[in-house]
Amino acid sequence: MRDSSKWFSVSEASRSWEEFYRKRWSYDYSVRSGHGVNCSMACSWEVFVKDGLICWELQKTDYPQIDPDIPNVEPRGCQRGVTASWYPYSPLRPKFPYVRKVLWDFYAEERKSGKDPVEAYASIVEDEERSKKYKAARGKAGWKRVSWDESTELIAAAQIHTIKKHGPDHMANFSPIPAMSLLSFISGHRYNNLLGGIYCSYYEWYHDLPHVSSSMFGDQTENCESSDWYLGTYWVVAGSNINMTRTADAHFLSEAKYRGSKIVVLSPNYSDVTKYADTWVPLVPGSDGAYLMACIHVILKEFYVDKETPYFTDYVKQYTNQPFLVVLDKDGDKYQMGRFVRASDIAEYAGEENADWKLIMTDGEGKLHLPTGSVGFRWEKEPTGNWNLQLKNAVTREEFDPLLTLLGNEDRNAMVSFSNFTDTFNIDMGKTQGKGQKAVEFLREVPAKTIRTNDGKELVVTTAFDLLMAQAGVARGELGGDYPEDYNDPKPYTPAWQEAQTGVSRDLAIQVGREFADNAEKTKGKSLFITGPGIQHFYHGASLYYRNEAVMLALCGCNGVNGGNFNHYVGTQHTRLNAAFVNLSGALDWSRPPRLMNTTSLWYFHTGQWRYDNMSLDTQWSTGAKKLPEFNHAADMNSLAVRLGWLPFFPQVDKTNPMELYKDAVKAGCNSDQEVKDWVAGQFRSGKLNFAINDVDAPENRLKMVTVYRGNLIGT
């Protein structure tokens, strides 16, 4: 029956379907949780459970207030997190073990014949025809579901056979990023390391490690809390798509803009984060380093040469290596950059503990000082309280003002050799020639002086800052050499030079470099970088492009300042319980060291990628290099590093089971671990033993097992 308005009607039809919607949001209980994925957000979610199943989730907004002047941490969460509940029940998620049917049929047949598991597995892998047949089935369908016990038996049989026949160093274990789920990471790696398998590094899962953090700052990717972004008043975002990869923190970006912060985005494409940019720098992919070098050139010229910036110079003197003296090595009619001047060089300080690891500065009166804070103070047997960065002489305890540059205090100008790598290879993908172009030498003068060592020798020295000025191409005073005349001179590393590399206007490089430093001067360091894997995927990304960012920050006094800093974000590589984590996962309570290996080298050699790497290393050598390697390929350099003990590689010994090698050492009369080590070293020296890397394709030197868990090795 319908009323006259035609809007309502009375019906006898069932309305039971409404119960579905009423029950949709009912639940038995809720728990507080997060999502153990490879991100650093750690977002808090309330997970609602019904009949033992996750039915829905809700973002929580009860984070503690950090500071009344900083926006709330919430809202937190992202599209990936809100869909996480679907994954446990996805039809695409395997619920049971699966084995290639071809392999399982062979194994089941051998087991039925009365062989034990190890014998059954051995009879398959040592049969060339059957081994080839089951391996050929890879990459196709043809899985067979087996029980958990059956799968465990097959895996254990394979491991036992591999250890007995080839050695535990023929088994590799790979799993990415421990911090996203510590227990599962530890369990797998502990088991592997108790067996003596290869403990593969995990950072290469997505790109290179940011070396600059360790080499410049002494620790690995220590980044600020994301709420600290809000305090930054000048942002440069490079290689990090914040909205996409740090969604839960992206609100600080928009909030900082409301506060008046300026956002500069270095991105070849109009990415998600680019829409927030006040200045978009659409540079050629992989040319970030060139652009940043031009910014450094501008900062050095305008804030160190054209005028003195007290905040910058005070910061650089106290917190960087720029005032340290560097030896210049004579090379014909020019000089090459050498090592730092050490305390062991100077009679007054030569008796210091760890003198080779303590460095020297000078002041305006020409006096040499041993400042506190060098790494040698960190490892003194008896702490002296000098492991800090105060500008005090560690011996006399007097404060001093170090010279940042010798200009005006020099007794000579030294012509120093630098290498120009501009045209060594073409960054356009697919166009890199195999040989490339060698680096070109250019000569630039730096102010220098002579000092006398404790053994009576004379050293020509300059400061690290003077070398940086010359490297960046910043002309000063009467210094001669191949310096550019101005910003429009296309010599390294001017704004005009970067224009040819990046496709970006020189004016835009001048603008960003000037604004970055001007903001840092006025705010005492509140200029920051947010950076990530978009840069690290390139050949020199993690080492050189990142270094340019770090140098800009150091020159402008931004590191260690709220609202400043070098902020590298990728995933959750840090573990809060690191001491326990390292001991448990590495099984260090049982034996040490574990067989650690960088995964890049493992794949490079064991998948034959080195055969397809046709780039010679001509482009890598400095023009001052005196002796080049006999061979000129990355594989040769890797092999050299292994032979010299710089880099572990497994399997380790050519066509040799390390367990059998130990037995041979005992037979030879070795009674202690040290005697075994000495005996093995002697076998290598005599040529009776060789490293497996030199014949990595030999069947005896190939990996026999690779275990992958917690990650999609190929797909991601």
What are these regions (language model features)?
Residues 444-446, 485-493, 544:
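Short acidic alpha-helix initiation/capping motifs at coil-to-helix transition points
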Residues 176, 314-319, 515-516, 530-534, ...:
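A glycine-rich phosphate-binding loop feature that marks nucleotide/adenosyl-phosphate handling sites
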Residues 181-187, 537-546, 576-585:
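Short glycine/threonine-rich loop-to-helix capping motif typified by GTGT followed
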Residues 1-459, 466-474, 493-496, 505-508, ...:
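N-terminal export/assembly segments and adjacent metallocofactor-ligating motifs
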Residues 164-168, 181-182, 498-533, 543-550:
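Gly/Pro-rich turn-and-neighbor structural signature
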Residues 228-230, 521, 697-702:
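Extracellular/periplasmic catalytic domains that process cell-envelope and extracellular macromolecules
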Residues 554-558:
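Oxidoreductase and adenylate-handling cofactor-binding alpha/beta cores
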Residues 166-170, 306-313, 523-528, 560-569:
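Flexible, glycine/charged-enriched surface loops at secondary-structure junctions
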